[in-house]
Amino acid sequence: MTQVFQGRSFLAEKDFTREEFEYLIDFAAHLKDLKKRGIPHHYLEGKNIALLFEKTSTRTRAAFTTAAIDLGAHPEYLGANDIQLGKKESTEDTAKVLGRMFDGIEFRGFSQRMVEELAEFSGVPVWNGLTDEWHPTQMLADYLTVKENFGKLEGLTLVYCGDGRNNVANSLLVAGTLLGVNVHIFSPKELFPAEDIVKLAEGYAKASGAHVLVTDNADEAVKGADVLYTDVWVSMGEEDKFEERVKLLKPYQVNMELVKKADNDNLIFLHCLPAFHDTNTVYGKDVAEKFGVEEMEVTDEVFRSKYARHFDQAENRMHTIKAVMAATLGNLFIPKV
């Protein structure tokens, strides 16, 4: 009998039910425990996994690679210079070729349509490692981290600070409300989430008992916050907008003043990384020299504070990605959830 996840792709949060998403989070926690105790879990023994990367990555590549190896699979990295998606070969043709050679495909790139075409034509599970619209594997790691810290998800309040229309904000809104988490977007009006994303999240919120708030008012945004979350001010492909974003988003920086507004000693801080919290990067130095800003979306004080959980969050990328690959490609018995 085919189990509920078998053969499915993982392209966007909206493709899964609340129960399915919760199952993947809990399954990831189980796999994390097995890893910590040194217990083998080779659910993908003999499988070959293609890792397609249009966009560069540290965490996503490392997480998929180690997760595949831990599961007994062989990962093969194909970077932007190795694949011809839509250039010399159509995505459809590439998908059909890769689907005959690999058992599963990860894609990290720009177009959501491209990852959907890979899933449509390859005949194997396809996992979205990030597109301009969605970042579903990040969400599993994020909400696993939240659950590890609070023991639950339902009824908590997560506040995202910064660019409210990027892929992380989209995914936090949809995944959070799906899971019963109140999601606040603290952003300038110019960068409020798209109306269709907000409406989608509001629909999930109505079903789960959560609520959605989109505001440019700091006091309103962080009231009752359990989680403060931020991301880089300039997404990949938007590097020419640094000056504009620095000026626009400086008031939305996560700093100790904002943390104190939440008035919650159990608050945690999350960041999907990389973070520009100092000048120890080329970008950091460049922004400091050009615009006089040494800390961008989060201050170094908060980044290194007792509230910070971003390195736990980064580790959880591996465990949650492992859960997705094992559930969709492994020959596991998973009853209907």
From Swiss-Prot:
User: Would I find Transferase among this entry's keywords?
Assistant: yes
Provide the binding site for L-ornithine.
Answer: 167, 231, 235-236
Q: Name one GO molecular function term.
A: amino acid binding
Q: According to its record, what are the GO cellular component terms?
A: cytoplasm
Organism domain of life: Bacteria
Q: In which pathway does it act?
A: Amino-acid degradation; L-arginine degradation via ADI pathway; carbamoyl phosphate from L-arginine: step 2/2
Chain residues that bind carbamoyl phosphate: 57-60, 84, 108, 135-138, 272-273, 317
SUPFAM superfamilies assigned: Aspartate/ornithine carbamoyltransferase
Q: Does the keyword Transferase apply?
A: yes
Write down what this protein is called. Answer: Ornithine carbamoyltransferase
Organism, by scientific name, is Streptococcus equi subsp. zooepidemicus (strain MGCS10565)
